[in-house]
A protein has these predicted regions:
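General beta-strand structural signal in soluble alpha/beta enzymes
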Residues: 33, 63, 106-108, 137-140, ...
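Short, acidic/turn-prone active-site loops that include or flank metal/cofactor-
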Residues: 11-12, 36-39, 160-163, 167-170, ...
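Alpha-helix boundary recognition
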Residues: 26, 96, 149, 177, ...
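Class I SAM-dependent methyltransferase SAM-binding "motif I" and its flanking Rossmann-like core
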Residues: 109-179, 234-236, 251
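Short gly/pro/ser/thr-enriched loop/turn and capping motifs at secondary-structure boundaries
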Residues: 38-41, 142-145, 171, 191-192, ...
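Short secondary-structure transition/capping segments
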Residues: 81-87, 107-117, 149-156, 182-195
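Class I S-adenosyl-L-methionine
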Residues: 1-134, 215, 220-223, 233-251
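A contiguous loop/helix-start segment that scaffolds small-molecule binding in enzyme catalytic cores
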Residues: 4, 173-251
Length: 251
């Protein structure tokens, strides 16, 4: 393989795919999708719908099975490193089977730069090659952008910083001094519940027919979000959620 396009496709709506992304997609001979199991088949189906909508040239789609990951590790960083290494081996084996002049493509939810491991895994694949393929990255609409649009709001007040972090860090470290707005993605434990006086804008599976959004004071809507999130996981088989929590004015 001579070239791999890593293409951000937004939150799942084919209409969110940028013109630049469509142009990059139409240079691709073979798209690589990660099979995450039957419970998350819709994640593959969304990518397939995007290809059906935007591709104008012959192409193939190949899949590799996502290696298992320890979800309750003693050492979180080490567990993720092991998982990324297994992903890199699986992806490398698949790309090795393609012709030397082939152009590959990987469709990344949201934007490849934010809360996604694709580029890290691709770097590991390239590091093992004597003559590594070229990588070109096309940005996409991020889930925080899609969240803000769905709620018709902005992420920050005037002159206000925004912290983007994980649910785990929010639970363990709390909110740093001087931070009044926090964006979190993929938080199954709903860490915002620890901030009952703050205001939350929450959304899940944005850009898909199952999209849900809720907003309000955490003490008023927090438990409803927990229930809605659990119900969505039962119905759809997966949840990708994002939320913005903001400190009340004057606090």
């Amino acid at each position: 393989m001579r070239l791999l396009h890593v293409i951000g496709i937004g939150a799942g709506d084919p209409d969110q795919v940028t013109v630049a992304a469509v142009k990059a997609m139409n240079e691709v001979d073979v798209f690589v999708l990660i099979d995450k199991g039957s419970a998350k088949q819709e994640l593959v189906d969304v990518r397939t719908r995007i290809l059906d909508e935007h591709m104008r040239r012959p192409h193939r789609v190949v899949e590799f099975v996502d290696p298992p990951r320890d979800r309750t590790p003693r050492d979180y960083d080490a567990a993720v490193d092991t998982w990324h290494d297994a992903r890199a081996r699986a992806l490398g084996d698949l790309l090795d089977a393609e012709p030397d002049d082939a152009v590959g493509g990987m469709l990344v939810w949201g934007d490849p730069s934010l809360y996604d491991s694709t580029l890290r895994v691709v770097d590991r694949v390239r590091a093992r090659l004597d003559d590594p393929f070229e990588v070109r990255v096309t940005p996409g609409v991020t889930s925080p952008s899609a969240l803000a649009a769905a709620h018709g709001t902005v992420l920050n007040r005037v002159g206000e910083p925004v912290l983007t972090t994980t649910g785990r860090r929010l639970r363990e470290d709390g909110v740093p001094d001087g931070v009044d707005a926090v964006v979190v993605m993929l938080d199954s434990d709903c860490g915002f519940l620890a901030l009952p006086d703050w205001h939350v804008h929450w959304g899940a599976n944005l850009g898909t027919p199952d999209a849900v959004v809720l907003a309000g004071r955490v003490s008023d809507v927090g438990e409803e979000i927990v229930r809605v999130r659990a119900d969505l996981r039962r119905r759809a088989g997966w949840v990708m959620d994002t939320y913005l929590v903001r400190r009340p004015l004057g606090r």
